[in-house]
């Protein structure tokens, strides 16, 4: 899979030990926190705290993700390549299907293909 010039990736903001990420469209050659082309949403990986009473009731702490679906679909349609972490988020959001290839998956698939070719020979 070739990497395009435009990527959808995470840009870190927030304080020390309290990360907040912006989901941004940026030039792949720019620094992580450089000015992006467009901000698509936010991702807070630390779950919001719940009280003991809520824990007893079975309330599960959740991670906050806010995303502009229309703009994200537009950028993917134009050819922007999401990073691996953003790909996972977009799969959970239902924007990408499970067949979407990442560089990590394609390397694993190549190894499996080569192993099968060796066993067939």
Curated annotation (Swiss-Prot):
- The answer to keyword tRNA processing applying to this record is no
Entries under InterPro entries matching the protein? Ribosomal_bS16, Ribosomal_bS16_CS, Ribosomal_bS16_dom_sf
Under Gene Ontology molecular function, one entry of this record is:
structural constituent of ribosome
Biological process (GO), any one = mitochondrial translation
- Provide one Gene Ontology cellular component: mitochondrion
What Pfam families does the annotation carry? Ribosomal_S16
Keywords assigned: Mitochondrion, Ribonucleoprotein, Ribosomal protein
Q: Does the keyword Ion transport apply?
A: no
Which compartments does it reside in?
Mitochondrion
Role, per record: Component of the mitochondrial ribosome (mitoribosome), a dedicated translation machinery responsible for the synthesis of mitochondrial genome-encoded proteins, including at least some of the essential transmembrane subunits of the mitochondrial respiratory chain. The mitoribosomes are attached to the mitochondrial inner membrane and translation products are cotranslationally integrated into the membrane.
Q: Which family does it belong to?
A: Belongs to the bacterial ribosomal protein bS16 family.
PANTHER family tied to this protein: 30S RIBOSOMAL PROTEIN S16, SMALL RIBOSOMAL SUBUNIT PROTEIN BS16M
The record's note on quaternary structure and interaction partners says:
Component of the mitochondrial small ribosomal subunit (mt-SSU). Mature yeast 74S mitochondrial ribosomes consist of a small (37S) and a large (54S) subunit. The 37S small subunit contains a 15S ribosomal RNA (15S mt-rRNA) and 34 different proteins. The 54S large subunit contains a 21S rRNA (21S mt-rRNA) and 46 different proteins.
Output this protein's name: Small ribosomal subunit protein bS16m
Top-level taxonomy: Eukaryota, Fungi, Dikarya, Ascomycota, Saccharomycotina
| Originating gene | MRPS16
């Amino acid at each position: 899979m070739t990497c395009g010039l435009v990527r959808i990736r995470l840009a870190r903001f927030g304080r020390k030990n309290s990360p907040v990420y912006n989901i941004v469209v940026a030039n792949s050659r720019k620094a992580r926190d450089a000015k992006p082309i467009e901000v698509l949403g936010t991702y807070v990986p630390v779950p919001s705290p719940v009280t003991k009473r809520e824990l007893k009731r079975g309330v599960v702490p959740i991670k906050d993700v806010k995303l502009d679906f229309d703009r994200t679909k537009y950028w993917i349609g134009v050819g922007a390549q999401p990073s691996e972490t953003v790909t996972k988020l977009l799969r959970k959001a239902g924007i990408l299907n499970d067949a979407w290839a990442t560089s990590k998956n394609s390397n694993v698939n190549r190894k499996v293909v080569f192993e099968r070719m060796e066993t067939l020979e």
